Structures are given as C-alpha cells and as structure tokens.
From Swiss-Prot:
Its main location: membrane. Disulfide bonds join 100-192. One of its GO terms (biological process) is G protein-coupled receptor signaling pathway. InterPro entries: GPCR_Rhodpsn, GPCR_Rhodpsn_7TM, Olfact_rcpt. This is Olfactory receptor 3A10. It holds the Pfam family 7tm_4. CDD domains: 7tmA_OR3A-like (cd15233). Residues 50-68, 119-145, 222-239, 296-315 are cytoplasmic. GO terms for cellular component: membrane; plasma membrane. Keywords: Cell membrane, Disulfide bond, G-protein coupled receptor, Glycoprotein, Membrane, Olfaction, Receptor, Sensory transduction, Transducer, Transmembrane, Transmembrane helix. Glycans are attached at residue 8. Residues 1-28, 90-97, 167-200, 261-274 are extracellular. The chain crosses the membrane at residues 29-49, 69-89, 98-118, 146-166, 201-221, 240-260, 275-295.
C-alpha cells in the first residue's frame, strides 16, 4: 500500500525491526545465546510444572499460582524470542503490520496477567502467615480460580485497549522500529498522527497494571513482616521469611525492569537502553524464576529430582 492511498488509514504494511545489533558478525553469537536462554527457560518452567504435578506436597494454593506463573513465563518468552531468532538467522527482520500488532497484544496480555498474578501470590502469603486459621477456607480452589480469572480479564482489557489504540494510529512514513520486538514506545515514535490519547492510556494502564499491584503487594508484605517479627522462635522467623523471599525476589526483578521501561512519562522515544531493559524483562526474568523458586525449597528440589530421574513419589 502506498502512503496516503487510503487517506487516514495506515499506509505502512510492515515494520523493520533493527534488533539488538546491526553487526553481522555478532548475530550468530546472539542467536546461540538466546536460543540457549529460550531452551533453558522453557525447560526450567516445564520442570517446575512437572514437579508441582507429581509432588503431593506441592498441591497447595501457593504452588497453584506458581504453576500459572510458569505457564506465563513460557508464553512471554515465546512471544518475543522465537521471532527474534528467525530475524537473527535472516540478518533482516521485516514484520507484517498485523503480526506486529498481534505480538504487541499477546505480550501485554501475558505480562499483565503476570503483574496481577504476583499480587495474588502476595495475598496468598498474607493469608497463610497472618490468617492461618481461616486460610483453607479463604483460599479455596474456587477462590484461586476466581483470582486467576480476574487477572486474565483485567489484563485482556488492558492489552485490547492498547492494541486498538495503536491500530488506529497513522503510520505513513518511516517503518524502522528501534527494538527487537513490537512494543508501544518505539511504535509511538513512528506514528505520524497524535499519540496524546495513547500516552494517557499508557499512564492509566501503567497505574492499574503496575502501581496498584505494587501497592497491594507492599501492603501484604508489610502485614507479613509485622506478623513474622512477632514470632519468638528464630527458626520460625527464618521459615516464614523463606517462603516469601523467592516471591519478593521475582517481584523486584519483574517490576524493576517494567517500571523503567514504561514509567518514563516524559519520553516515548526508543533507545538502545530500552533494548537492554527489554532483555531483562522478556528473557532474563522468565529464565531466572524457576531457579529462584527452587533454589531454597527442598520440596521443589525433591520433586524435580524425581521428575528428572523418573522415580515415583513414595506411597
């Protein structure tokens, strides 16, 4: 389609992603590195899922949410890394307009569910430590399913809103995206129509998908910390904190990189720094999550050993 052929409609039919580097010599090395990272991430998260499935001790609300988080991590990295690997092999990355918009939608859908699921996990820890007597009834299977359903619904609305808002923008000039996947800030930079509404939607979305969950997580853990500090036994304190330490580490990595990427409200321009943060957010975080959750958890470690060795759980 030629520019201006359809009036105010989108004239650009595809986008060219610059990727991580234009150095042809580095591209094979990057392919090997990120292919390895992808295999490790998918394998690690599938191992966590298998461990939760085979280990009766892990059939609890906390690990139900962790299993969903593992599925989300597989989805998030699968949305961005395989297309990037294809581009590294081809030495050029030309993405059709529809494919770019689809990638944008699914990335924000999965990342949004991730945000709210981490909040649900914090609420679960709050109930387990601060309200142990009513925990089993207040975190029943129905409640668990409802929380996951709410996470998905809110994230779907957010992702759909951003996708529709981007799809009505005019792209009638440059089509080179300075990133390795299609995301909001670099696409805003290419629009030849006003992005004021998109900027406001991004602010509102970042508030509901990032700030509000982070406040809820902070409040939950403030209550948890207060409850743990009232425990007189040092061993009891360590055990209580150990169940929350892994989750807090994941929260810090996920929200730290996410806020840096989307809360720079004064600028929507893309830069090489955004690519580095994008790697942390889309690749490193999903890859580290299985390691973080299994590193100091003997139940998960035991289940993983049985999965890897093929041994059944002792009856």
């Amino acid at each position: 389609m030629e520019p201006g052929a359809w009036g105010n409609r989108t004239a650009v039919t595809d986008f060219i992603l610059l990727g991580l580097t234009g150095n042809v010599r580095l591209q094979p090395i990057l392919f090997v590195v990120f292919f390895f990272a992808y295999i490790v991430t998918v394998g690690g998260n599938l191992s966590i899922l298998a461990a939760i499935f085979v280990e009766p001790k892990l059939h609890t609300p906390m690990y139900y949410f962790l299993g969903n988080l593992s599925l989300l991590d597989i989805g998030c990295i699968s949305v961005t890394v395989p297309p990037m690997l294809v581009c590294l092999l081809a030495h050029e990355c030309r993405v059709p307009y529809a494919a770019c918009i689809s990638q944008l939608f699914f990335f924000h859908l999965l990342a949004g569910v991730d945000c709210h699921l981490l909040t649900a996990m914090a609420y679960d820890r709050y109930l387990a430590i601060c309200q142990p007597l009513t925990y089993s009834t207040r975190m029943s299977r129905e409640v668990q399913g409802t929380l996951v359903g709410i996470c998905c619904t809110v994230s779907f609305i957010n992702a759909l809103t951003h996708t529709v808002a981007v799809s009505v923008l005019d792209f009638c000039g440059p089509n080179v995206v300075n990133h390795f996947y299609c995301d909001l800030p670099p696409l805003f930079q290419l629009s030849c129509s006003s992005i004021y509404l998109n900027g406001q939607l991004l602010f509102v979305g970042a508030t509901f998908m990032g700030v509000v969950p982070m406040i809820l997580i902070s409040v939950s853990y403030a209550h948890v910390a207060a409850a743990v500090l009232r425990i007189r036994s040092t061993e009891g304190r360590k055990k209580a904190f150990s169940t929350c330490g892994s989750h807090l580490t994941v929260v810090c990595i996920f929200y730290g990189t996410g806020f840096f990427s989307y809360m720079r409200l004064g600028s929507v321009s893309a830069s090489d720094k955004d690519k580095g943060i994008g790697i942390l957010n889309t690749i490193l975080s999903p890859m580290l999550n299985p390691l973080i959750y299994s590193l100091r958890n003997p139940d998960v470690q035991g289940a993983l050993k049985r999965v890897l060795t093929g041994k059944r759980y002792p009856v």
